[in-house]
């Protein structure tokens, strides 16, 4: 396991980003950003004709709170699915046609953000990165 010491991670951070577009115009892009107090990410894939956009974004706080949103935008509109363990969220209420998945908050949190550590995000299959 990892040992966590706040002085060791204070101010430490890392980020990566990517963007690709083929000759037709299909694209994907994304970034990961993390530091001792949390991290954020975003990924998106879209076709050349604007017919569909699929993506996800999210954040993690040092205290263990997480929010991950996966979405699809197409001719049917924008549809989002929110996965979170944040206090005050209620999965029985569906705000603006958005599905909220409330997880149990962790009782103990053992560390900060570790660059390169996997935090439960599943990128759409088209990305080929995970």
Swiss-Prot record:
The keyword Transcription does not apply. InterPro entries: CHIT_BIND_RR_consensus, Cuticle_Struct_Prot, Insect_cuticle. PROSITE patterns: CHIT_BIND_RR_1, CHIT_BIND_RR_2. Residues 24-90 form the Chitin-binding type R&R domain. It comes from the Eukaryota. Keywords: Cuticle. One of its GO terms (molecular function) is structural constituent of chitin-based larval cuticle. GO terms for cellular component: chitin-based extracellular matrix. PANTHER family: CUTICLE PROTEIN, CUTICULAR PROTEIN 47EF, ISOFORM C-RELATED. This is Cuticle protein 14 isoform b. It comes from Limulus polyphemus.
